[in-house]
Design a protein with these regions (language model features):
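Acidic/His metal-coordination segments adjacent to aromatic residues that form catalytic metal sites
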Residues: 23-43, 102-126
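Helix-loop segments that flank and shape redox-cofactor active sites
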Residues: 52-73, 114, 130-145
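Internal, conserved structured core segments that host functional sites
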Residues: 110-159
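Conserved alpha-helical segments that form or flank metal/cofactor-binding pockets of metalloenzymes
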Residues: 2-13, 75-103
Length: 238
């Protein structure tokens, strides 16, 4: 049996990005084919949004210039609005704290793993992890009932702070081109950590059934491809 949560982020990334033969249609698992419970789906998503809010707040505090602080405050506002709107989508009489509680500890561990050692790594972490996780939850939400799916997708795609983060990263790299190599390396590490979080969102912290990892890999490849395009736009090698 494969235990992804015992593997390093680099091993996870290598597994997902290596060359592969085409998987038979019947063996491939599409995230859209899974049918998560709405309360559990939103509980996971809200727990992650909460730690993103904490990360964004720290990035505002550590920002080196007034302009950077202003940009990141706006990104923080966007994440806060998203969190509020997702809470409103919980089933009636569902306690938001109760929905998040089973997932919050793992979300906090994830946040610590991707925190970075300085402000530049913090901002790239926000850019990479929120991009990957948004793509993941949009795809994973495809298995929700139509009305719930449409409402969640609207919230997740309506407004993002990505352009603001990109602006700060591009400005930093132009000012100090030597940052690019370190940022590219950090970005690759972030992919592994975030893919692991996505896998656990589907399977939970337990052994996967035989072959489950292999069946999910093609679904994650689409998400990694979108990440690669975002890194290319920054001039960083994904």
């Amino acid at each position: 049996m494969v235990r992804w949560f015992d593997r390093t982020p680099r091993e996870v990334t290598r597994s997902l990005l290596r060359a592969r033969t085409v998987v038979a249609e019947g063996d491939r698992v599409l995230l859209q084919d899974l049918e998560p419970r709405l309360d559990q789906y939103l509980g996971q998503l809200l727990a992650l949004q909460l730690v993103v809010l904490q990360q964004a707040g720290q990035a505002v505090k550590d920002a080196p210039t007034l302009a950077a602080k202003a940009n990141l405050v706006e990104a923080l506002r966007i994440v806060s609005t998203r969190y509020r709107d997702l809470v409103r989508l919980l089933p009636r009489d569902t306690d938001p704290l109760g929905a998040m509680e089973p997932f919050y500890a793992s979300s906090e561990r994830f946040a610590k793993e991707v925190a970075g050692v300085d402000w530049y790594e913090q901002v790239l972490s926000l850019h990479v992890t929120t991009g990957l996780l948004t793509d993941f939850f949009v795809a994973y939400g495809g298995g929700l009932p139509d009305d719930d799916r449409d409402a969640v997708v609207r919230v997740l795609t309506r407004e993002t702070g990505q352009p603001l983060l990109v602006e700060e990263l591009q400005r930093a790299i132009v000012a100090n081109p030597r940052l690019a190599a370190r940022m590219a390396l950090w970005g690759r590490r972030l992919v592994g950590d975030t893919l692991l979080q996505m896998y656990l969102a589907v399977h939970g912290p337990a052994d996967a059934a035989p072959g489950a990892t292999r069946r999910l890999e093609p679904a994650f490849n689409d998400i990694v491809a979108a990440h690669t395009r975002r890194m290319d736009a920054l001039g960083l090698t994904a």
